[in-house]
Amino acid sequence: MRRLLALLLLWSTNSMADQPVLRFSVAESWSMPLVRIEDDQPVEGLLHDLMQAVAREVGVRPEFHVMARLRLEEAMSSGDIDVRCYVSTQWLNDRPRDFVWSIPLIHQRDVLVGRAGDSTPIPPERLPPQAIGTVLGYTYSTLQPLLDHGQLHREDSRSQLLVLQKLQAGRYRHAVSNQLSLQWFNQGLPAEQQLQALAVLDEQDLGCMVRNDPAIPTQGLLRALVRMKQSGQIERIVRRYGGTGDPDSMSVARPEIPSKMPAHSQRN
């Protein structure tokens, strides 16, 4: 029996070694429910499960490259990664010509978040001059006019989790978060301590970009993502980590810049 188990283990190890490798990028700014990173490798989370699932679909071995978000486009251009997931066309300065887009896979909302008990909806242009919690390297197109005019001032953290933790601790009065991360952060808190979504700032359909290279199964991977989306597998992964689709009916805020704007922002 032991010999049989040893042979099965050896066969499994050799089979994995024979599989082609596909290099997936992982942004170090991601936190749960997107991904949890241990020893510079993702070990669980929505995107970890999605990337593992699509790798199984096409019979490749995933290799995860954790890097700063600001390095992702450089890594794509230099050929250091094969697949980048959880990305929007709005986030790229220049689209790498040798990458192909998948179909939209996940719908994301960015929301303005207030402290516990601060549940009154407020459009961002009505915020008084203040620092606002943001993630280092992330762009917030809806808020950019307010940042440019000095009404708001970025208070950057390295991850979305740190942004929400600092808001909870009172470092600032408002922050920006994607809806999934906010729901995950709140799920273990009593209702009176939960952070509040005050306005939807933006919505994006996110997908994956795959290197168009004959050395990797580009079209097979794109077709696998289509099958996973059509079968409901991706939605099941999202729900596994607390995603509820469309949690409320708040409309997307489009700030109007007042004619007179304070010249400088002020910190809390």
Residue ranges and their predicted role:
Residues E63-E74, E155-Q165, A169:
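Short helix-initiation/N-cap motifs at beta->coil->alpha
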Residues Q19-L46:
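Short glycine-rich His-centered loop
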Residues I37, M51-V60, W101-I103, P124-P128, ...:
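Ligand-binding cleft/hinge of the Venus flytrap
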Residues G45-E57, G117-P121, E125-A131, G137-Y138, ...:
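Extended ligand-binding regions for polar small-molecule ligands
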Residues Q52, F64-L127, L136, Y140, ...:
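Acidic, polar ligand-binding/catalytic clefts
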Residues V60, S77-Y86, Q168-S177, S181:
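Alpha-to-beta junction loops
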Residues E28-W30, I106-V111, Q187-V226, T244-H264:
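Periplasmic-binding protein-like
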Residues R61-F64, Y138-R154, R158, V226-N268:
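Ligand-binding clefts/hinges and TM-proximal coupling segments of bilobed small-molecule sensing domains
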